[in-house]
């Protein structure tokens, strides 16, 4: 019977005790010597039974040489027990909860039965156990004292008598603890406390503490430093008596006590890092050992950090040989090729097994050897199982079948190409090598359009290249990692590659209708020349004579007809911004391709550019595959570049110069801006700037200046009037999307304008309000605050240049500081989501725990989507009926069809209007991403038909309607299988919802009125194609969607954080782009959030269209504390007098007059008799009171209600201009008395505390609402005619701060439309499902247009809320979601602490996910390894055919 094999299903962690060490140890260390002569000393710490790292001797245990021996542990029998340094806290817990006399528990175990196992002992030990009586032996439990100076020493305080607990005594105490007690306190039998005190410690194998000896005998030697620690440990152990007996309370000799302490310290240093470098001869506590100039190494020190065993050796990628060099561009290479220097090709070797079919091909390599390229370096002989150097072979050496030849790399080999950081899976791609024969070349070369995969450029970037060795790995690499697989981005669902820069401009120049010289035409020979380097089948030019002229559109059409598609879209070239200043040819303002022929328009970035979703290459990829799309990119690139080389294209300084008239006009515009800025300065100096609610005068002034100094759109007019768009290279680059933007063009030609850093102008950094030393003190002109009047072409002055450099310096610092944070955030996301894998039901689960019932809620792969428009969404009821209701045949079926279309439209509107109401910036649109573009399929079918328009009859129309209806009904069975479809088993609701959007589109595009000219056979073909594409768009089984989500979110989020400065210049973010993402992914509570907001809709429809009323409501909910209304305050110590004429402080003598008036006007508010000598005098800010609409009466009423132990007097509200409103608050004696009615010795502190309470008193508003402003919203509503109308006159309240519950209590706020950006606040009020949706919307809001596909956001949200609580992507969140996956948590961070906790809890770690199998040395079950393959080796052996037998059969 043959023995089978099995995979490791789980790993259990336990505390290793004496028995475990003795069972694993192969020998006992008794002496500290290393060698005796030339061999290891027997019984020494380098005993040959523990392994070998020396080629002079073998391992005695396994009889292997140093390369094959894995090492074997030994043991050191201690003369006195030692505590386990990793579990000191656990030892203390046990000492607190068990009787030191009998080992019985002194706590009631039933009190902790309801707790989970790991919490029981911790909770029991945290209670009061001192002085308790043991239930068994009735002994009083003493107080356990942890020595504050010595980490390893415990003391017991028994009724004033203090004794030291030596490890031997602790071991005896723990030996009395029963297994039943251990289990009831939540620990495993394998984690008995007796194992926490060791009599035998393990000595690690030789292989992990190697030594080097050069020569034999007295030659130079070098051994690992940890051997010195072990030597010290053995020597100190020998100094202690063998049979040392210690009795509790007994005094032992001082030298023995010191030796015991030193041994414990040495064992600690052996396992863990030293915290200090003090010598072991003096001091106490955690003392360290110094080896030379550095602390001694430890075993656990090898685990953490990037250079540790876990991240570097176990999780890190390792290859035998790799090459690295700088990259440069080469447009002659295909996108899937890489140019490889010949010097590299002769260094890297490829192992290839000699077979009958390749021996003739390999023979030249064998004969060339190392002398000539291509050659080889060595041969592995199968018969002798030995490796031979090619230069040392004998004359009669033969290359035979089965040998392995290590040959040079040649053109056509596949290789991995990688650029770090590898933020996406496309960062590692497989290319075909093209060996560069020129020996002077030493850089890697690649097509410029291939840079997008690696986010690379040619400014000195370096990349790695390595060649897979085996045939299996080469085939696997090409199938799984070929760059064609990365053509469609998982992140954005659009194409990654396309034309860039030169080829984009070339495509435009080739396809435009006219040139400055006239028609854009060429003769036959020139057209043929363009195709020379495209490496495609050349088009037929036989029908053209040498004198015939071809335009660029015809030439491009010859190429596009090889992959016929249909395309129609406005090009980037046409812009409404440029239309007033230039003449557009009517044939160039709309690009249209019909069945592969470019009818009109030009090819620019929107059609052929990199990342153009819905562009030409995207359509080709969807219909013909990504490989064909890559070929078309290369071919188009060659056409464009060849044309540019012939026709010429350049950018010169002449393209950047303005005419004198245009320059004068630009200066007039700049002077207008400066004049407006000066007027704002004058308003500031005269005090005429009145800031709105929520802004200070300075902030509002800066905001006015920024708005005033922005270049208006009309500055483009002089630029456009001074250039010729048909010949200006700079403008053509910008207009076609090849490079640059309008602001770049303005900065180069007209002026740079205001420099901003963090949404602010340059602020004064020097004394006396100076931004730079070039400007006078307290200068207010715009130039002193970073406004640059000159353009780059005109040149900058010294201060202007410095302002520009300040902006660049801020970018550099911001990037440097953010890189580490974003890198760690990316790593946390990868580890947090890596266990999420798609199973056979297209569910996403972590091992067996469900995360998503269906991946992405629709089961679709983000790479298999297209953008389409739903025609019915924006139509009114009447428009829908006119366009989609078929009235040619009177049948209830068509009434049913129209009713279904109307219900689909209303359902779509309902869903996305709800999303619009609960998202700050996501408006309803009729454009969505779906897996199948039905309209394109219908158009392609009709264009490929040769029968023309056929007459239609009633029977065929009804049959087609029935076909579509049945197809839509059965579409969800795509998620199940054909058997269930034939049986018509019930479809789960979530699968019906998954296909609902696709069914809506099918019913729209295949409505009866749109398919009258389609035959039943064509309809059948259309439905088959839809089903095929829909099935191919489903996510694959075993896909690691968690990692895909982490990569797709982390990469653009990293870019977002690095670009936060640029975003803030445009007013898009706060001062730091990293704050909000950290708040979202860290699941911070409400009180810890810095940037929370609320959007509040008003309940009354009439009020929400009136800005004034909305502002009044905003004022009423904004939290106003008394401190915000005060100009200044004073705490006075004075004696109150009824005559009011002896006010202590002369500066406030004028208060006597209004105080007298107050008493006369308020006869019922006379001062009480118990007024104290403390008075708080406050001056109110009348401006703030007016802006906040707060009356003095409301302030006084609020203060009297909140502070009854005071007497309040105030001046009148309507004071003259310049005279403040004054409030005097006299404290009463009752405020200074305790419950004993005795006066406090000092009352100054009480008075100061009263001031703090007073200033923080709430006058009005909702707690948590720091600021409230009125904003204008744009929302959609359905009118009575069913028309989707856009309303842009709605006012809502946007708050800084959040309090959903408080806002719901306000009668003016609509409680059903309250939106808060706070995930925690949403969770508290609405529950976990609302929090999940809030995570999605907040990530989308933060990342904006650069955000990834929403399926990745769903992955984040579902994982963070899977447990019923919002968990973070930090270490704590991973512990909550996957508490049993010890190996994963250990790989993330703090491996020593994680392993210690796992051993204490006896954790069982199931092997699943990616990190855990990798650490165990197995292959994770993902991708193609997700499915098990069963192979009948016996059948294969019996039916094996040799080459000769196959030839005979042939």
Swiss-Prot record:
What would be one Gene Ontology cellular-component term for the protein? DNA-directed RNA polymerase complex
Q: Which organism is it from?
A: African swine fever virus (isolate Tick/Malawi/Lil 20-1/1983) (ASFV)
Reactions catalysed, as given in the entry: RNA(n) + a ribonucleoside 5'-triphosphate = RNA(n+1) + diphosphate
Q: Which cell locations does it reside in? A: Virion
User: Which InterPro entries does its entry note?
Assistant: DNA-dir_RpoC_beta_prime (IPR045867), RNA_pol_asu (IPR000722), RNA_pol_N (IPR006592), RNA_pol_Rpb1_1 (IPR007080), RNA_pol_Rpb1_3 (IPR007066), RNA_pol_Rpb1_3_sf (IPR042102), RNA_pol_Rpb1_4 (IPR007083), RNA_pol_Rpb1_5 (IPR007081)
Pfam families referenced in this protein's UniProt entry, alphabetically = RNA_pol_Rpb1_1 (PF04997), RNA_pol_Rpb1_2 (PF00623), RNA_pol_Rpb1_3 (PF04983), RNA_pol_Rpb1_4 (PF05000), RNA_pol_Rpb1_5 (PF04998), RNA_pol_Rpb1_7 (PF04990)
Q: Give the induction annotation.
A: Expressed in the late phase of the viral replicative cycle.
MF annotations from Gene Ontology: DNA binding; DNA-directed RNA polymerase activity
One GO term (biological process): DNA-templated transcription
Q: What does this protein do?
A: Catalytic component of the DNA-directed RNA polymerase (RNAP) that catalyzes the transcription in the cytoplasm of viral DNA into RNA using the four ribonucleoside triphosphates as substrates. Forms the polymerase active center together with RPB2. Part of the core element with the central large cleft, the clamp element that moves to open and close the cleft and the jaws that are thought to grab the incoming DNA template.
Principal EC category? transferase
Q: In the UniProt record, does the keyword Cell membrane occur?
A: no
Is Nucleotidyltransferase one of the keywords UniProt gives this record?
yes
Q: Which UniProt keywords apply?
A: DNA-directed RNA polymerase, Nucleotidyltransferase, Transcription, Transferase, Viral transcription, Virion
Entry protein name: DNA-directed RNA polymerase RPB1 homolog
About its domains, the entry says: Lacks the typical C-terminal domain (CTD).
Q: Which Gene3D superfamilies match?
A: 1.10.132.30, 2.40.40.20, 3.30.1360.140, 6.10.250.2940, RNA polymerase ii (3.30.1490.180), RNA polymerase II, clamp domain (4.10.860.120), RNA polymerase Rpb1, domain 3 (1.10.274.100)
């Amino acid at each position: 019977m043959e023995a089978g094999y099995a995979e490791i299903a789980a790993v259990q962690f336990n505390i290793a005790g004496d028995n475990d060490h003795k069972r694993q140890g192969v020998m006992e260390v008794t002496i500290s010597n290393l060698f005796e002569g030339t061999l290891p000393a027997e019984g020494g710490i380098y005993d040959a039974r523990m392994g070998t790292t020396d080629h002079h001797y073998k391992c005695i245990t396994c009889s292997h040489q140093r390369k094959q021996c894995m090492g074997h542990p030994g043991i050191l029998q201690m003369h006195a027990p030692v505590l386990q340094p990793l579990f000191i806290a656990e030892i203390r817990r046990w000492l607190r909860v068990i009787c030191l006399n009998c080992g019985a528990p002194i706590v009631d175990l039933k009190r902790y039965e309801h707790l989970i196992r790991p919490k029981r002992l911790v909770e029991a030990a945290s209670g009061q156990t001192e002085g308790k009586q043991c239930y068994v032996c009735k002994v009083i439990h003493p107080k356990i004292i942890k020595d504050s100076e010595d980490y390893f020493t415990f003391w017991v305080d028994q009724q004033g008598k203090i004794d030291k607990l030596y490890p031997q005594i602790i071991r005896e105490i723990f030996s009395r603890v029963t297994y039943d007690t251990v289990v009831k306190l939540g620990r495993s039998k394998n984690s008995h406390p007796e194992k926490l005190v060791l009599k035998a410690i393990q000595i690690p194998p030789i292989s992990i503490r190697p030594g080097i000896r050069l020569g034999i005998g007295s030659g130079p030697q070098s051994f690992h430093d940890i051997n010195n620690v072990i030597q010290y440990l053995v020597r100190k152990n020998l100094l202690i008596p063998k049979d040392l007996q210690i009795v509790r309370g007994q005094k032992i000799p001082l030298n023995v006590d010191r030796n015991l302490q030193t041994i414990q310290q040495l064992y600690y240093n052996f396992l863990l890092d030293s915290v200090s470098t003090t010598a072991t001869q003096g001091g106490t506590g955690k003392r360290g050992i110094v080896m030379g100039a550095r602390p001694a190494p430890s075993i656990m020190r090898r685990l953490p950090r990037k250079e540790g065993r876990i991240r570097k050796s176990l999780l890190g990628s390792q290859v035998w040989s790799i090459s690295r060099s700088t990259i440069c561009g080469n447009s002659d290479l295909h996108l899937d090729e890489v140019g490889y220097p010949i010097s590299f090709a002769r260094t890297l070797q490829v192992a290839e097994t000699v077979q009958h079919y390749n021996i003739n091909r390999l023979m030249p390599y064998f004969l060339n050897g190392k002398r000539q390229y291509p050659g080889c370096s060595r041969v592995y002989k199968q018969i002798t199982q030995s490796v031979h150097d090619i230069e040392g072979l004998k004359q009669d050496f033969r290359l035979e079948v089965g040998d392995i030849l290590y040959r040079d790399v040649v053109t056509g080999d596949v290789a991995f190409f990688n650029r770090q950081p590898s933020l996406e899976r496309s960062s590692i791609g497989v290319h075909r090598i093209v060996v560069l024969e020129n020996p002077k070349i030493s850089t890697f070369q690649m097509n410029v359009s291939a840079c997008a995969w690696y986010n690379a450029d040619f400014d000195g970037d370096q990349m790695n290249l390595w060649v897979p060795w085996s045939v299996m790995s080469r085939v696997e690499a090409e199938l799984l990692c070929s760059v064609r697989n990365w053509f469609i981005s998982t992140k954005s669902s659009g194409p990654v590659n396309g034309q860039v820069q030169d080829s984009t401009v070339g495509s435009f120049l080739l396809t435009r209708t006219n040139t400055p010289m006239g028609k854009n035409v060429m003769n036959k020979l020139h057209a043929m020349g363009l195709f020379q380097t495209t490496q495609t089948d050349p088009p037929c030019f036989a029908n053209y004579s040498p004198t015939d002229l071809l335009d660029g559109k015809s030439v491009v059409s010859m190429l596009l007809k090889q992959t016929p598609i249909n395309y129609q879209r406005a090009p980037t070239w046409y812009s409404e911004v440029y239309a007033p200043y230039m003449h557009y040819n009517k044939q160039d303002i709309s690009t249209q391709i019909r069945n592969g022929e470019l009818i009109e328009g030009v090819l620019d970035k929107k059609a052929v550019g990199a990342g153009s979703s819905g562009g030409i290459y995207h359509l080709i990829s969807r219909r013909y595959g990504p490989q064909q799309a890559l070929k078309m990119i290369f071919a188009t690139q060659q056409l464009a570049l060849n044309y540019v080389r012939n026709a010429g294209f350049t950018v010169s300084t002449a393209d950047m110069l303005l005419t004198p008239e245009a320059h004068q006009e630009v200066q007039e515009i700049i002077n207008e801006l400066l004049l407006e800025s000066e007027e704002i300065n004058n308003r500031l100096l005269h005090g005429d700037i009145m800031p709105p609610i929520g802004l200070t005068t300075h902030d509002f002034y800066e905001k006015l200046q920024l708005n005033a100094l922005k270049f208006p759109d009309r500055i483009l007019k002089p630029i456009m009037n001074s250039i010729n768009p048909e010949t200006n290279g700079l403008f053509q680059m910008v207009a076609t999307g090849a490079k640059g933007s309008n602001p770049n063009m303005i900065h180069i030609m007209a002026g740079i304008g205001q420099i901003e850093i963090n949404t602010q102008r340059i602020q004064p950094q020097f004394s006396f309000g100076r931004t730079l030393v070039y400007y006078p003190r307290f200068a207010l002109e715009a130039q002193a605050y970073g406004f640059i009047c000159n353009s780059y072409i005109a040149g900058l002055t010294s201060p202007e240049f410095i302002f520009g450099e300040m902006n660049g310096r801020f970018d550099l610092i911001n990037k440097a500081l953010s890189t580490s944070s974003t890198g760690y955030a990316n790593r946390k996301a990868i580890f947090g989501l890596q266990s999420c894998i798609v199973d056979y039901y297209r569910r996403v689960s972590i091992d067996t725990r469900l995360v998503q019932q269906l991946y992405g809620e629709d089961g679709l792969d983000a790479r298999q989507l297209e953008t389409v428009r739903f025609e019915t969404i924006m139509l009114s009821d009447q428009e829908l009926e006119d366009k989609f209701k078929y009235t040619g045949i009177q049948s209830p079926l068509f009434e049913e069809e129209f009713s279904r279309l109307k219900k689909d439209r209303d359902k779509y509107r309902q869903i996305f209007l709800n999303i619009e109401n609960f998202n700050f910036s996501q408006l309803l649109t009729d454009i969505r991403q779906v897996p199948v573009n039905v309209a394109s399929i219908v158009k392609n079918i009709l264009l490929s038909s040769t029968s023309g328009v056929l007459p239609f009859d009633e029977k065929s129309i009804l049959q087609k309607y029935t076909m579509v209806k049945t197809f839509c009904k059965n579409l969800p069975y795509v998620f199940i299988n054909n058997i269930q479809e034939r049986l018509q088993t019930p479809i789960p609701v979530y699968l019906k919802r998954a296909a609902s959007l696709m069914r809506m589109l099918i019913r729209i595009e295949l409505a009866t009125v749109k398919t009258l000219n389609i035959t039943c056979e064509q309809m059948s073909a259309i439905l088959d194609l839809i089903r095929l594409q829909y099935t191919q768009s489903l996510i694959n089984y075993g896909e690691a969607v968690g990692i895909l989500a982490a990569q797709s979110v982390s990469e653009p989020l990293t870019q977002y954080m690095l670009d936060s400065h640029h975003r803030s210049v445009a007013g898009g973010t706060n001062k730091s782009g990293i704050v909000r993402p950290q708040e979202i992914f860290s699941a911070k509570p409400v009180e810890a959030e810095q940037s929370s907001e609320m959007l509040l809709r008003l309940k009354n429809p009439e009020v929400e269209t009136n800005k004034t009323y909305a502002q009044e409501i905003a004022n009423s909910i904004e939290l106003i504390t008394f401190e915000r209304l005060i100009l200044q305050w004073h705490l006075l110590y004075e004696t109150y007098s009824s005559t009011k004429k002896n006010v202590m402080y002369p500066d406030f003598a004028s208060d006597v007059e209004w105080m007298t008036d107050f008493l006369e006007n308020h006869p019922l508010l006379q001062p009480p008799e118990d007024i104290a000598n403390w008075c708080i005098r406050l001056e109110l800010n009348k401006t703030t009171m007016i802006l906040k609409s707060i009356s003095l009466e409301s302030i006084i009423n609020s203060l009297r209600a909140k502070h009854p132990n005071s007497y309040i007097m105030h001046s009148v509200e309507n004071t003259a201009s310049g005279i403040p409103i004054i409030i005097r608050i006299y404290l009463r004696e009752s405020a200074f008395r305790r419950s004993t009615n005795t006066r406090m010795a000092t009352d100054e502190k009480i008075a100061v505390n009263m001031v703090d309470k007073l200033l923080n008193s709430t006058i009005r508003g909702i707690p948590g609402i720091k600021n409230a402003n009125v904003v204008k919203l744009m929302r959609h509503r359905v009118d009575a005619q069913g028309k989707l109308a856009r309303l842009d006159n709605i006012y809502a309240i946007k708050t800084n701060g959040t309090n959903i519950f408080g806002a719901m209590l306000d009668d003016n706020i609509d409680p059903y439309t309250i939106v808060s950006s706070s995930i925690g606040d949403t969770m508290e009020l609405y529950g976990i499902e609302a929090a999940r949706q809030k995570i999605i919307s907040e990530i989308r809001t933060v990342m904006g247009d650069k955000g990834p596909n929403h399926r990745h956001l769903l992955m984040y949200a579902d994982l963070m809320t899977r447990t019923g609580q919002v968990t973070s992507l930090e270490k704590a969140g991973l512990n909550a979601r996957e508490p049993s996956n010890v190996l994963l948590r250990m790989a993330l961070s703090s491996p020593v602490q994680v392993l210690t906790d796992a051993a204490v809890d006896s954790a069982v770690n199931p092997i699943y996910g990616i990190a855990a199998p990798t650490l165990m040395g197995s292959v994770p079950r993902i991708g193609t390894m997700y499915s098990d393959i069963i192979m009948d080796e016996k059948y294969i052996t019996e039916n094996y055919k040799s080459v000769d037998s196959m030839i005979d059969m042939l």
